[in-house]
Amino acid sequence: MKALFSKILVPIDGSDYSFKAAEYAIDISRRYQSEITLISIVASKVRYGDSSGIFGAIPPSYLKKYENEARKWFNRVLEKVKKDGLEIKKIKTDVITTPLSIVSTILRHAEKNEADLIVIGTKGITGFKRMLVGSVASGVVTYAHCPVLVIR
C-alpha cells in the first residue's frame, strides 16, 4: 500500500517561515518515509524599468549569487535532517530559474514530480484580502492538485 505522503515538495525562500515549513516536512517524512524535494525559485521575468541588466533582464551574476544563496538554505535544512537522523538521500534540491510566476512554478513542479503534499511557509501579512495567508501560499492552496499544508 502506498504511503499517504510519499513525495513532499517544500518551497524555500530563505525566510524563517520556509525553514519552519521544512521542519514540518521533515517530521512528516519521518512518519511516512517520504521523499522531500526542496525548491527555490528565481523569477527571471523581464521587468520594464528595472535597472538590472539589459532591458531589465536579471544578469547571470545575480542568478549565480541567488543560486549560491539557495544552496546555503538547502544546506541549513540538510543539517537539520542529519541532526534528526534521517536519510539525506531522500532529499532532493532544485534551484529553478523561470519567467513564470512563483505560484505557477511551484504548481508545475509539484505536478511534474507527482508530489502528493506541498508544505509552504507564509508570513500572512501581505494585505487585507490575504491577511491569513500570503499571496504565494494563497495561490498554491487555490490551484494545487494535492493537499497543501501552510505553516505560519
Language-model features and meaning:
Residues K2-I58, K83-L86, K90:
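Small/aliphatic-rich secondary-structure junction motif
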Residues Y24, N68-K80, T105-L107:
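Short, solvent-exposed amphipathic alpha-helices that sit
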Residues I39, K92-I96, L149:
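General small-molecule cofactor/ligand-binding pocket signal
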Residues A57-W73:
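A short acidic, glycine-rich active-site loop
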Residues R108-R152:
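Gly/Ser-rich helix-loop-strand patches that form or flank binding pockets
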